[in-house]
Amino acid sequence: MAASLIVEAGRLVLCDQATADLAGAKATLSADLRELSQQADLILVFGGDGTMLRVAREVAGSNTPILGVNVGGLGFLTAVSSEQLPRALACVWSGDFVFEQRSLIEAGVQTHEKIVQQTALNDFVVSRGTVPRLVELEVGVDDAVLTRYRCDGLIVSSPTGSTAYSLAAGGAIVSPNAEVFTLTPICPHTLSNRSVIVSLNSVVRVKVLSRRVETVLSADGQVQTQLSAGDTVEIRRSQRAVSLLRLVGSSFFETLRQKLHWSGSNL
């Protein structure tokens, strides 16, 4: 349906190679995601937030806006449902939209084997692996030590990621335009440990102290790197961002009311 709506409006449809193969499209109309982001005026992503996160990392730094169409689950990042797509595209053609720049975050870690760099839109998580034992982490912000955690893990989320894993672990909901990191421990052994909010311009350092517990770094819950005792993960704001398209009249707070079933959903 989406392709026909776009063609009827006199626009050209491009798709990434994997989608082209799945749909049986001609190879001349396909490109990899990075190449596509340089050629297209708008990227349509069909799926849930997981699909949006993957695409955002792959096209990071591109100025091409992304419009997410939710055919998955909760969908905080997917702006419209499949039923709303015809109206949404009509709004796009008429210019009834705004761009939202979402900062990405980066993590760098020098393991015993190599230097690893990862990018995320939502969050980085340093956590235990498959064995259900507490990990011990030392956390610092810039040049200051924050604390040591004995916990299942630590979530360092961007403003965009505040409604993801961090929210489920008791973290605060943060407006996407707030320039902050949210540091949320997962099941900390010290009951007074709570979510901490620091500037997005800070560098958050997480040092692995545990020697007998498998520890991993996860980017957006999708890309994992094995960590060892003594490894330090440095998380900072990326110089790259992604542009999400939002229809005029919609807002982050409207999304909260609808997705979380808060009072006022019918306003």
Ranges and model annotations:
Residues 1-42, 83-98, 109-118, 248:
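ATP/NTP phosphate-donor binding region
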Residues 25, 54-56, 77-78, 136, ...:
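Short glycine-/acidic-enriched loop or helix-start segments at secondary-structure transitions
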Residues 45-49, 56-58:
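N-terminal glycine-rich "phosphate-gripper" loop used for MgATP/nucleotide binding
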Residues 49-51, 74, 160-162:
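Short glycine-rich anion-binding loops that position phosphate/pyrophosphate groups of nucleotides
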Residues 54, 59-69:
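Gly/Ser-rich helix-loop-strand patches that form or flank binding pockets
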Residues 73-152:
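Catalytic core of DAGKc-family lipid kinases
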Residues 126, 142-145, 193-267:
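ATP/nucleoside-binding phosphotransfer catalytic cores, i.e., glycine-rich phosphate-binding loops
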Residues 134, 147-192:
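Gly/Ser/Thr-rich active-site loops/lids in small-molecule metabolic enzymes
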